[in-house]
Amino acid sequence: MNPTAAQPLPPNPYNAHAWITGDPEIGEGCWIGAFTLIDGQGGLKIGRGCNISCGAQIVSHSTVRRCLTERVLDVVDKRLTEIGDHCFIGTNAVVLMGARIGHHSVIAAGAVVLEKADIPPYSLVAGVPGRVVRSLEADVERWSAEARAAKL
């Protein structure tokens, strides 16, 4: 039996059921759902006001090469992963190491953003592998204008 299996997840200020590793930079006003993995071991920056939905995984390292070479190549690959301000990461979405997601973007539920992907701001990304479906810039502008008008 694994002696650490019965230990609780390391405490974090976001969600008792989220696993946050390494030392990620997480911006002010972020919400992180239960059963998420936030891997800061290879460098991770999450901007202000992001929502990371339940079950999402954001990773900044990989042991693929180490595993496949039977540890002949005994390294853990690490790469900075960046998520811009005010991004929404959907339920069970996966963001792999080295990906850059521009501000005000949505990663749809179940999407997989591949290593080194560069997602422009205001993008809606869906699918496996994740692809930009369309721009959300006009939608965000309209929603903001409607919200401002409703407050008058």
Task: List the model feature ranges, each with a label.
Residues D139-L152:
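Acidic/histidine-enriched, glycine/proline-rich intrinsically disordered or flexible terminal extensions
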Residues Y14-I26, W31-R100, K116, S123, ...:
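Flexible, glycine/small-residue-enriched loop-and-beta-strand segment within the central core
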Residues I101-E115, P121-Y122:
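C-terminal/domain-terminus segments
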Residues M1-P11:
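A transmembrane-helix-recognition feature enriched in membrane-embedded lipid enzymes
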